[in-house]
Amino acid sequence: DTAKIATFGLCGCTAVAVVSEYLDGSKSAHVQHFSPICQELSESVFRSVMTKNQGVVSRKVVVMVPGQWVQNGDGNTIIVPKDQASLNSLLQAGNLSDDNSVKVYPYRVTSGHRYGQGTLMVELGDEPVIYTECIQLNLTKSSS
């Protein structure tokens, strides 16, 4: 059986999807929408979920954050997290680092576009799949 869980319409909020696999072969998924109004409570709930490490073999985490367009050193325009301090606080609350098991996806926050306003979904089947903006992510260890 396949189960799906999602959040959408982030419109400036942050969302996190966590897929955990356990020693017994079972899997779990957690999707959370972080409102700036109750950030402290949201981080507390997230911390509680992330500290349940009993029997976890692997964990994949995707964080969607509001983004902003900047010009990088090569002169290319790229989208980066708008508030790196909030992202760092969230990663710290979950006892995570911005490494290969954590993928950060900044999304554009504009009033004129419905697409790209923050959709995050987990499909939990034989092989868990995470989607951002309805696009399947490659979460293998070799991805960049």
Name the predicted role of every residue range:
Residues 1-144:
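Active-site microenvironment for binding and transforming phosphate-containing groups
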